Regions:
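Short aromatic/hydrophobic "clamp" motif used to bind/position activated sugar donors
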Residues: 82
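Short, acidic, metal-binding catalytic loop of nucleotide-sugar glycosyltransferases
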Residues: 21-30
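Cell-envelope/extracellular polymer assembly enzymes that use nucleotide-activated donors
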Residues: 2-4, 32
Length: 180
């Protein structure tokens, strides 16, 4: 498929139970969904096989951490685009279409991310990445929608696409050719 959504999982059965249904519901027609098990010791692998048999699994022989786990898993995935998605992200209708359209339209972009809203208060941005990030003149990272520990309410102020310096790994779409 053109898009592979790869969810790195380590003992995250509860997160998969809560958030994977939205990924399957809103993505299965447009993407291959893959859960990469980073040496999980819970029964998330068995649960996944029973509840979502069409979701592909990659089983890693040890826990390689976040970056290492994704690197090992993505070597086993063939797709034009990768989406790295945390197992605690709930997606919504059309989320994937908009990302694909953005990347297809701007061939010079290596990656993009959507706005991320908090699962606890859907009117506020998510702390982990909000709406993309920048560096200030001192090299300190900050993101649209969050300054230090304070997150903004989403009032549509970041609905316009813009260039960012960094994107969060919580939900990152990247061209596979640029990843490697």
């Amino acid at each position: 498929m053109k898009v592979a959504i790869v969810i790195l999982n380590w003992n995250g059965k509860a997160m998969l139970q809560k958030y994977l249904p939205s990924v399957v519901r809103y993505s299965q027609d447009e993407a291959e969904i893959i859960v990469a098990h980073n040496a999980s010791t819970d029964d998330s692998l068995q649960w996944l096989a029973k509840e979502f048999p069409k979701v592909r699994t990659i089983v890693l022989d040890q826990n390689y951490g976040f970056a290492g786990g994704y690197n090992k898993a993505l070597k086993q995935v063939e797709s034009e685009y990768y989406i790295l998605l945390n197992n605690d992200v709930e997606v919504t209708h059309h989320w994937l279409t908009e990302l694909i359209e953005e990347m297809d339209a701007k061939q010079t972009n290596a990656a993009c991310q959507p706005k991320l809203l908090s699962v606890y208060n859907k009117d506020n941005f998510e702390y982990a990445g909000a709406a993309g990030g920048f560096l200030d003149k001192y090299g300190y990272p900050y993101c649209r929608g969050r300054i230090f520990e304070n997150v903004e309410e989403d009032n549509g102020q970041y609905d316009t696409n813009s260039e960012i310096f960094w994107a969060t790994g919580a939900c990152l779409m990247i061209r596979s050719k640029d990843y490697w």
